[in-house]
C-alpha cells in the first residue's frame, strides 16, 4: 500500500482514528502545539509514531509506504519512520469522528537526484538538523577529495522499534571548508531491513563498493551486503551478493565490515562480532580473491579480553606501519604493527581523541579521523581530529 492521507488543522485540539476488528489501526491527535500520528503494524504491538509541532491552518500529509512512513507539515518533511510487516490501515478504511480527510494513492518520485544536492560550510560540529543527527562515520579519500559516509539517525537510535533504521548519507570536501551533500548512498528500501549498519568503502576496477550488514534482530543472522556505483554518487544494491559469518561467531550481531586490498593480492574483511564458545568479542577475519566469494581466514585478527565487542574496525598502512583500529564502549583504540594482520600492540596511550567511534583516511600526508559528538542520546554532530606519526608509529593528534 502506497497511501497519502491529507488534512488541514482547522481546530485544536484535534483527534481522529481508524479501527477495525476491535483494534486501532491509525490514530492522529494534536494539542498543545504538537501533533502525533500513530500507525499500527502486524509486526509489533506498539505503533510507529510520527511527531511535529503544529498550529492552526497547517496542512498535514502522512505518507504510508511499505518501507517508510513520512509526516509533512506545509510541504516540509518533519518526521519519518521505517516499518516492518503489514500496516493494519488500508485504503478505503474510514475515520471517526468524521472530518474532511483525503486518502489517495501515492507514487514515489523515481527521478535520479543530481550528484551534488546542496553545499554547506564547515563540518566541525555539523549535523543535518530538523530531527536528524550524525551517527557512525566512515571516511575515505578519493583523489583529492575527502569523503564521509555517515549513519543518518532519527529518534536517537529509537527508530523502527529500537532497531535504529539507519541509512547511509554522503558528503565530501576538497578543503575542509566547503562541503558537498550527495544523494543518500544506502537507503532502507525493504521492510525486512531493520538497519543499514556501519561498514566501509572500496574501489575495484573503476567500480565503487560499499559493504555493510543489514540488521533485523530477533535472532536473525545479519547478512553482509553491498551496494555498487559507477560514478561514486549513485549507489545501487547488489541483490546477488550476500553471506553470513560462520557459526563459530555470533551471527546476529555481526556488523561493521571493513574491506581492504592487501599486498598479498587478496581482499580482507574485518567484522565486529563475538566468538560463541569463548564468549569473547572479536574482529572476525575473512578473505577473498575477487570480493565475490569470502572465506573465514581461520582466526580473528583481534579477540577481546571479555565479552565486549570491538566496534567499527579500521585498518590501514601509514608511514611504514600497519594500524588496526576499533572502538570499545565508543572510544577508539589503535594498535601498531610492522607486519600486516599480526603482531599488533597497543601504545602506552591507545585512545584516538575524536569522540565516538572515529575512523580515518589519509589526506595530504596526515590521517584525518572523523567521529561524532553525541547530543542528548546516540546521534550527534560530526567532529574531526588530525594525526601524524612518530618513528615508532605512535600517533600525535592535533585539531584539524
Predicted regions span which residues?
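Mobile "lid/hinge" segments at catalytic clefts and subdomain interfaces of large enzymes
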Residues: 361-363
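A generic local secondary-structure boundary/capping motif
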Residues: 258, 358-359
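Beta-rich carbohydrate-recognition and catalytic domains
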Residues: 16, 23-28, 34-55, 59-60, ...
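Short hydrophobic/aromatic patches on beta-strands that form ligand-binding or substrate-lining surfaces
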Residues: 1-11, 62-64
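Basic DNA-binding region of bZIP-type proteins
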Residues: 67
